[in-house]
């Protein structure tokens, strides 16, 4: 499975009890957890009630539920626990399974840090530029990941970032103190946040080396982090 997907589960059930009128009554709960037992979402619950006819002799009830795979969870093995109760027989059964999640893995940190800063040619590029060189009139794109921020009650996070662009002599060419704010409360703890920035170079932009000073602030953890990355205009 991939990060951010919501697969629909359809699980057949056997061995249930029927009444004299061929009625069945099942309830179920489905939990998805990480390797540490942390729930990915609130447990999915439901019930199956049906009146069977002679034509349904080969029919099996199915448990249907959607499992949300959060978009920024680490790749790896995850657990699925299904609990089914037969209300007529006053019996229950548990079933366990595992599933693998694919996606990007960001090295964790105990303190605020920026990882994987990469310059791009366009907004949608997935491969970083081997040499961060642009021409006057180009758009400078960059992406990065922020991790190590503190989580508050209910897995809330509150981070923001701004930037300054310095010329080769250290003077300021551009500044955007608050380029973006990322504040959210999630069911599953989100340990990193992707960031993006862009600059539009003037057609008469002076050639030379420039430095982006990226300043990240963790408002809940009272932390700051500064990253410096160079690019050139040729």
Region annotations inferred by a language model:
Residues 1-234:
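Intrinsically disordered, low-complexity terminal regions enriched in Ser/Thr/Pro/Gly
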């Amino acid at each position: 499975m991939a990060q951010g997907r919501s697969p629909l589960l359809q699980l057949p059930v056997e061995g249930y009890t029927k009444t004299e009128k061929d009625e069945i009554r099942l309830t179920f709960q489905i939990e998805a957890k990480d390797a540490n037992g942390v729930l990915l979402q609130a447990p999915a619950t439901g019930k199956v009630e049906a009146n069977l006819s002679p034509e349904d002799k080969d029919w099996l009830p199915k448990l249907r539920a959607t499992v949300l795979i959060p978009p920024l969870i680490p790749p790896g093995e995850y657990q699925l626990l299904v609990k089914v109760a037969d209300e007529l027989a006053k019996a229950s059964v548990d079933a366990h399974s595992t599933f693998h999640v694919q996606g990007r893995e960001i090295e964790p940190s105990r303190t605020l840090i920026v990882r994987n800063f990469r310059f791009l040619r366009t907004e949608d590029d997935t491969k970083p530029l081997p040499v961060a060189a642009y021409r006057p009139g180009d758009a400078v794109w960059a992406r990065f990941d922020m991790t190590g921020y503190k989580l508050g009650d209910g897995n809330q996070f509150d981070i923001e970032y701004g930037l300054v662009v310095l010329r080769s002599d250290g003077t300021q060419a551009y500044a955007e103190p608050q380029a973006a704010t990322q504040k959210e409360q999630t069911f599953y703890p989100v340990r990193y946040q992707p960031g993006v920035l862009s600059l539009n170079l003037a057609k008469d932009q002076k050639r030379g080396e420039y430095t982006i000073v990226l300043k990240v602030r963790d408002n809940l953890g009272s932390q700051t982090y500064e990253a410096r990355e160079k690019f050139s205009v040729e």
